[in-house]
Swiss-Prot record:
Phosphate binds at T8, R48, H49, T175. CDD domains: MTAP_SsMTAPII_like_MTIP. GO terms for cellular component: cytosol. The lineage of its organism: Archaea, Methanobacteriati, Methanobacteriota, Archaeoglobi, Archaeoglobales. Although this enzyme belongs to the family of MTA phosphorylases based on sequence homology, it has been shown that conserved amino acid substitutions in the substrate binding pocket convert the substrate specificity of this enzyme from 6-aminopurines to 6-oxopurines. Its EC number is 2.4.2.1. It comes from Archaeoglobus fulgidus (strain ATCC 49558 / DSM 4304 / JCM 9628 / NBRC 100126 / VC-16). One of its GO terms (biological process) is purine ribonucleoside salvage. Homohexamer. Dimer of a homotrimer. It catalyses: a purine D-ribonucleoside + phosphate = a purine nucleobase + alpha-D-ribose 1-phosphate. Belongs to the PNP/MTAP phosphorylase family. MTAP subfamily. This is Probable 6-oxopurine nucleoside phosphorylase. Purine nucleoside phosphorylase which is highly specific for 6-oxopurine nucleosides. Cleaves guanosine or inosine to respective bases and sugar-1-phosphate molecules. Involved in purine salvage. The keyword Glycosyltransferase applies. The record marks E157, Y210 as: Important for substrate specificity.
Length: 243
């Protein structure tokens, strides 16, 4: 079984067959998961903001989500996300598969009662799969590496914050760093493909409208999911079916 974690629109795009909605109790809380099949492959999908879309980024229970996936036998987790572009030269919409991230603020961990230090990062195998698939089938420009800067949310960033972080990163979002950290702590492989749906605050001389960002993300989510579906098939063939 392969895990998929997506944003607010993933469950609106009907990709799963034989869907079973389930709630899994974990040591970190309850996770809601849709289990089903994509092209005959067993997958487990989590909507990171909850079925009711009522969990803002700073309140997502990443530990419960990833622990629940692991309890189902998932070893590989592919994320989908929406990010703001930190480079004026990027065209919109684009896809970016980040190779690293900066997350100074979330502090997420499963190790609250023990002293354990992991070396965080995205899984390079999954990243390479996403890059290969995106280059082959995406109709969007593909940015095959970049640094993802995670802010706490739920508010958007100030112009001053963007002016600072654009020196260190290529895109800005609110969840992928936390997901990558928890995945690594639980021994799961994780990488993410993101749609660039807007320019971050101050990158271009234009106002930022959250409702417009949401609409753009919804429009572009299908392209992102197309990549994820093909990546799921490739991971299944190369890493699961052969074992």
């Amino acid at each position: 079984m392969i895990g998929i974690i997506g944003g607010t629109h993933i469950l609106e795009i009907k990709v799963l067959k034989d869907v079973e909605e389930t709630r899994i109790e974990t040591p970190y809380g309850t996770a809601e998961i849709d289990v089903g099949r994509v092209d005959g492959i067993d997958v487990a999908i989590i909507q990171r903001h909850g079925k009711r879309k009522d969990k803002p980024p700073h309140r997502i229970n990443h530990a419960a989500n990833f622990y629940a996936l692991k309890s189902l036998g998932v070893k590989y987790v592919i994320g989908m996300g929406s990010v703001g572009a930190l480079r004026e030269e990027y065209s919109l919409p684009s896809l970016i598969i980040p190779h690293d991230y900066i997350d100074f603020f979330s502090g997420v961990t499963i190790y609250n009662d023990s002293l354990v230090h992991v070396t965080p990062g995205f899984d390079e195998y999954l990243r390479e799969v996403l890059v290969e698939v995106a280059r082959k089938i995406s109709s969007f420009p593909v940015i095959d590496k970049g640094v993802y800067f995670q802010t706490r949310g739920p508010r958007l960033e100030t112009k001053a914050e963007i002016a600072m972080i654009k020196s260190f990163a290529d895109c800005v979002g609110m969840t992928a760093g936390s997901e990558a950290t928890i995945a690594r702590e639980l021994g799961l492989s994780y990488a993410i493909v993101c749609t660039m749906d807007n320019y971050a605050h101050g990158i271009k001389n234009q106002s930022i409208d959250y409702r417009e960002i949401v609409e753009k993300a919804k429009e572009n989510a299908r392209e992102c999911l197309k990549i994820v579906e093909e990546a799921v098939k490739k991971v299944w063939e190369e890493k699961i079916q052969r074992t």
